[in-house]
Structure formats: C-alpha cells, structure tokens
Regions:
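C-terminal regulatory/interaction regions
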Residues: 187-198
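Sec-exported extracytoplasmic/periplasmic mature domains
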Residues: 11-17, 144, 148, 191
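Active-site HxH/HxHxD metal-binding segment of metal-dependent hydrolases
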Residues: 1-73
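Metallo-beta-lactamase
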Residues: 71, 82, 89-173, 177-182, ...
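Gly/Pro-rich turn-and-neighbor structural signature
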Residues: 59-62, 66, 80-89
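Short acidic-hydrophobic, aromatic-tinged amphipathic segments that line or gate anion-handling sites
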Residues: 74-79
Length: 198
C-alpha cells in the first residue's frame, strides 16, 4: 500500500478494461488513513525524502498524497491466495514487514519470487518514529519463508533482480539475520532501561 507501489495504478486502470485489483485486506485501510492524514503525510515525507516541494507537491495538503486515481482493491485476501492468470499460477502470501499489508508472490512455474519491499538492496527500513509501525520479527520470518521455497529468480520492487538459488538463499537469510539481530539488540537495550540517546 505504499505510494511508490500504488501511486501509478490509476494510469493502468485508465488504459485497461475490466482489470481487477487484488491486495491484502489492510490495503484499503491504509488508503483511508492516507486520506485522513493527507497533510501530515506530505510533511513527514518531506522530512524523510526532501523531494516533495521540488516535485510540485503541496505541503499544505491541497494535493492528494494518495493520487486520486488510485483504485481500492476489488478483491482482498487475508493469508494466502492462488490466482491463475494467462495459464500461470501466482501464489500470493501475506506477511508483515515494512507494512502490515505486504504481499510476496511465488510463481512456481518460474521458481520466482516477487518480493515487493521485503528486500530493498539496503539495510531494511525497519523503523521510522514518525510513520506507522514496522514489523522486523515478522519481516525476518517472511524472508526465511521465501528462502525455503528455493527460488531461482528473485524480483524485488526496488533494484536489480537476483538469479541463482544459492545466491538468493544467501541474500534472504543474511537480511533475515540482520533483522533478527536488530530485534534482539533493541529488546535487550529496552529491557536494560536504555534511553533513546544511548
């Protein structure tokens, strides 16, 4: 449900006839939150990315943070959903990670995973105090679940694809270990009474 993944959906919908938007059930709730906090989303994204003024966004919220043509999902799912499109099976899997509405997709005929933001070619964006809760423990488990599929092609939403089962396994388990370490260290510091500046 992040803007960088859905913001252009209106253009696809305008060019299609009868397209069906499928998403996790929390996506519509995220879109509603974007609408309710339109101005706030402009402000916090300006702080994080520093690009909204340059690109013509109005920080006062006159323009929509969620582009007005973005469709709500026509079909939703909770945990998993199998879709056959053009004779190809796509197995959608929900897991929490950078968002609570995240989907990763297994395409068995290609031994491929479409990973969305579960992988971004940088340390995972596991927390931002001005934004919605992130889920690093569940995120690590999702990466391990992907590795267990033994994919031969890995397609993240950002950055280059990865080919080769061994390479993909190494990448997925390395990022999972980093997230697990982050959680362990954070909990240890919290339980020891650490302050934000420690």
């Amino acid at each position: 449900g992040h803007i960088d993944h859905v913001g252009g959906a209106g253009a696809f919908m305008a060019d299609s006839t009868g397209a069906t938007v499928v998403a996790h059930e929390n996506v519509a709730l995220r879109f509603e939150r974007y609408r309710l906090t339109n101005g706030y989303n402009h402000v916090i994204n300006e702080r994080q990315f520093g690009q909204f003024r340059r690109r013509g966004y109005d920080l006062a919220g006159a323009r929509h943070f969620l582009p007005s043509g973005t469709p709500n999902p026509h079909q939703t799912y909770q945990s998993t959903l199998d879709l056959e499109i053009g004779g190809t099976l796509f197995q959608l899997n929900h897991a929490r990670g950078e968002t609570d509405d995240h989907t990763w997709t297994w395409v068995p005929s290609h031994k491929a995973i479409c990973a969305g933001d579960f992988f971004i070619w940088a340390f995972p964006n596991a927390g931002n105090p001005q934004k919605a809760q992130r889920y690093p423990r569940e995120w690590a488990q999702a990466l391990r679940d992907m590795a267990a599929m033994r994919p031969e092609l890995f397609l993240p939403a950002h950055g280059l694809p990865i080919a080769g089962e061994k390479r993909i396994h190494y990448v997925l388990t390395s990022v999972a270990e980093a997230l697990e370490s982050l959680v362990k260290q954070t909990l240890q510091m919290m339980n020891e009474g650490a302050r934000l500046n420690d």
